[in-house]
Design a protein with these regions (language model features):
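C-terminal peripheral helix-coil segments that are non-catalytic and often amphipathic
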Residues: 167-221
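Hydrophobic alpha-helical connector segments
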Residues: 59, 73-108, 125
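Inter-helical turn/loop segments and adjacent helix faces that build the functional surface
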Residues: 140-145, 164-174
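Amphipathic alpha-helical packing segments from all-alpha helical-bundle domains
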Residues: 117-140, 148-159, 178
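Short, leucine-enriched amphipathic alpha-helices that occur as contiguous helical runs
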Residues: 7, 11-19
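An extended, acidic
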Residues: 96-99, 104-122, 131, 154, ...
């Protein structure tokens, strides 16, 4: 096994161990030595590889987000010809399904982020990266300022829906799905910042630059 592979495997194990502790412990009370012991990795090596507990948490979030996107891609490809909006609904919904077993960790992170603005910014950046990856998966190149606005707009939708998801006890997360649809509809009504939600089969183009699009442009955030 190469050095890079060993480091990657160690990081995965440490991230999983930290994530498990996060279910019942605030991030600021998680100690790297305890995480290392749970992952069966020497403490010195754990400190060298991980850097910080926050880095381990972000690593685990990234792995879950990649899992959600890849699984959504497979589902979307099996579904055949569907609109970009439907793809986004499917991808957002599946992301909440992937995170469903980890609600305790998300609640801990939300509480910690309110106390620690630096952590909050790191988590916002992580969410932005996840939404950027998701939009690229559904066919948006997220290029330029308009693309970044769409990323932020969908990230805002995800944050708003998460408030409902955290208390959604339905087996199929039907309440969450309704909230996704409602929030996306509202975002569309706000303007063309989320032009990626427009179906290219029923509109001129996903990145329409017509005068109508310019006139309707707004801030989804």
């Amino acid at each position: 096994m190469s050095g890079n592979s060993t480091q990657s495997e160690m990081m995965d194990r440490l991230a999983e161990a930290a994530w498990n502790e996060l279910a019942t412990t605030s991030p600021r009370h998680i100690h790297i030595d305890d995480v290392a012991a749970a992952a069966e990795i020497p403490a010195a090596a754990a400190r060298a590889v991980s850097g910080s507990i926050t880095a381990l948490i972000l690593h685990q979030l990234a792995m879950l987000d990649r899992q959600a996107v890849l699984e959504s891609l497979a589902d979307i490809e099996d579904a055949g010809d569907v609109s970009i909006r439907e793809k986004i609904v499917e991808a957002l919904m599946h992301r909440f399904e992937v995170y469903a077993p980890h609600k305790a960790q998300i609640i801990q992170l939300d509480a910690a982020a309110r106390r620690d603005p630096a952590l909050g910014l790191r988590l916002l950046d992580s969410l932005g990266q996840a939404m950027r990856m998701m939009l690229r998966m559904v066919g948006d190149d997220v290029a330029g300022l308009a693309g970044e606005a769409r990323v932020r707009g969908v990230a805002l939708v995800a944050m708003q829906v998460a408030r409902v998801w955290k208390t959604d006890d339905s087996a199929d997360l039907s309440t969450t799905l309704k909230e996704i649809d409602a929030r996306l509809t509202r975002a569309e009504e706000w303007g063309r910042t989320l032009r990626v939600l427009r179906d290219p089969h029923s509109d001129a183009a996903m990145h329409d630059t017509s005068s109508e699009g310019d006139a309707d442009g707004g801030d989804a955030g």
